[in-house]
Amino acid sequence: MPQSLHPGETSPRSGSTLWHALRAASPTVILMLALALGISDAMFTVLDGFLWRPLPYPHPRQLVLIRERLLKAGLKGTWVSFHTYAALRKGTPFIRSAGTVDLTGGPLTIHGVKHVAFGGFATPSLFRTLAVPPLLGHWLSRASGRPGGPEEAVLGYGFWKSAFAGSPAAVGERFRFNGKRFRVVGVMPRSFFTIYPGADFWIPRVLTPARMRDHNINHVMVARLSPGTSPRELNAWLKGYRNRALAAASPARRLRAEQDGFTIDAEPLHKGLLKIFLGGKPVLLFLLALIGLLLPLIAIVNSINLTLVRTRRRAAGFAVRRALGATGFNLFQAMLGESLVTLGGVILGSLVVAGLGCSLFRTLIRSALTGPVSIALPFTIRFGEFSVIYGIGTALLIVTTIQFIALFFAGRESLLGTLVHEAGERGTARAARFMRRGFGAFQVLMATVLVMVGLVIFQSLVNILHRPLGFDPTNRVETMVITPHHVSMARFWTEIAPALRQIPGIRHAALGYMVPFNNVMSSHSTIHTPARPNESLYVRTQKVSRTYFRTLRIPFVAGRNFTSAEERDHTAVVILSARLARRLFGTVDAIGRTFRPFGPRSPRATVVGVVGKVSWRATPATNIVGMMYTPLTYPGYKFGAGNVILKLSPGALNHLRRIRKALEGAAPGVAVTQMTRLNTLIRASDRLFLGITEITSVFALVALFLTIFGVYALTAQTSLNRHQEYAIRTAVGASPASLNRMAFAEGCWMLTLGLPLGVILALFLSHLLEGVLYGIPGLDWPVDLLGILIIVSTVLVASWVPVRNIAQADWSHLLKSGAA
């Protein structure tokens, strides 16, 4: 006689033993949820590091970047002029303190040993604004920022470790830089950074009266808001300040400011750093977050479906328990107890996947953002408390929800009959059929979005890798050369050019302020078209040797190269890119035209040549009109650093040490950085987009796999429930083609419901990415159609395989199993 059951108990046969719990756990559900939740956990850990984790400053929300921008001219950076800094530092009630910082670098001598170091010119008030206590010593004193003040320096943590072996005795030591002796007064902690996180040292920026009248917009200003002040209040005040300043300016200056779209505003420091480190495209983070969110949704739908299938098989047992007095809560407790193994497996697996994913994403992002130079990032990406809490919380919530949904459908008498009696006039009950098709359509929708967006990003990467460079990087190397303050680059090149020609293996050599795909140094200017309305254009400008174009094989579209006399005699001549020539003069044939490139008081320059378009970075900057090249001796601006580019013959890499020695011996105090192949620079600049493509591709493949599995599982379960019907149809003469049509009909229902919505959402996301990705139009029909074809073929094949297997089976056996 069978033993009676109390409400909520299980039978001895099924048991509430550990072995029964292990058998009740579905490895497929554990694998799917662990993989999807782990990837999602890793992705949200990245978002936490970039978006939600505060910067390592006291009260970081009070920090803002003040910026002057010429919106109509294309100047949209994060810089100000010293004139504006001096005016705002004392005259703004909403700013508690402020400071500026600029990048510098060069040869630095400590105890007779030369180092190549990059640092910052910082006003002493910058450290008080950021308010990070020093690790050793103290900040730059206020007196050091005044004319005639002490020559002080603060070291960065990394340089302190490498140059002074991390010794506390470094405080008080002296080093020579730019012809001056500086005394070390402090060392900053490892986590400290300004706008340039890799700085080795900071020395005081002395603001003389003449410098405070400088209107050139090329300095970084960080300000701390007064307590209780919001950036919106400061921006309202800055707008009024801008209007008052223009009202007091001359009519010509006021007109020019209006034509250029001159504005002054403040941006939170966190937001500004995101734009700087992500190439002005922080929307890429939200794209990855969206993709990371879709995977768990697909896995959840699959898990719900599998759990429902298992629950339907136990529907009779649930009915018996309900008849014996078990409540819905008792059944839920029993199912949840059986799911503890599943829950533990999902939590453990998701945390393992999340830890591996965080490590992978951190390495990938650091490599993508810093390139071949490893520097400290202002954002912390680590697997910590947030990741563990997120993983455990989401796993607990999702597994509990799945069990509740399964119990809701299988534990209620009204729905129990619907799910148990699936044999109806057309094979399945309406509710079960609707639920099955709804699950399938949702999976199709999510997979369509991931596959189509993944293909769009992949197409962008292909466009990047096959973009026209405008120069030849093969067998070219470059190195940055930094000269002492008193040695001009023109003089340096005069000394070194003959020596380089004597070294075997060097076919061509050149010097320029910038080299393509090296983002360490850049120079931009706002110039105006010579004809009215004198439109403002934001352009790249650089001084180059006359061998620059031949060394990089940059083709001339019109005109000629600089002559030796023009390079020697300070002649005001320029070479323009083809796009800039069209914007300035309306034609590429601009040879002999003249204009004033650096303002109405600058010398009038003559155009002697026009060259083709050159790619300078992984994705083109839409706000930069073109490039203007000038000779090394062009009158006006000076620079103390540049890039030497060498065209080497095969096998000449053995002479790099001799080349470096020649460069360092050209003038006393010259510093030379590591030599890098141009092809290496190009690959490094593509790493961000390559990494995003790799992540998206992995997500898309996982989503496609989950969709195939989900559609196959749905169709297989339907086929299993209808196998007797299929056997009868086969027995009375139905052809395999008719059964295949029935299977394809189920797949078409899923496609009809899910594919259109998925395509619409994917096209919408592609439209948002149009300004972020390279070479992607709003609609790319070949790529979009390929994505649709992949989804359609995947769903139809997954729908057809289970029916094919049943159609090939022995129909008499199917009839007997169905009768049983």
Model-derived segments and spans:
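Alpha-helical transmembrane segments of integral membrane proteins
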Residues: 2-27, 272-277, 307-333, 337, ...
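Membrane-helix entry/capping segments
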Residues: 2-27, 57-58, 242-294, 313, ...
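Membrane-proximal extracellular/periplasmic loop immediately following the first transmembrane helix
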Residues: 11, 44-48, 52-105, 217-222, ...
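Alpha-helical transmembrane segments of multi-pass membrane proteins
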Residues: 20-25, 329, 333-346, 350, ...
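Short, strongly hydrophobic transmembrane alpha-helices
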Residues: 23-50, 299, 344-349, 436-460, ...
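Small-residue-rich transmembrane alpha-helices
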Residues: 45, 265, 304, 340-415, ...
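Mid-to-C-terminal secondary-structure elements
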Residues: 119-142, 151-283, 363, 494-688
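Interfacial "coupling" helices/loops that link adjacent transmembrane helices in transporter permeases
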Residues: 299-343, 709-751, 802, 809
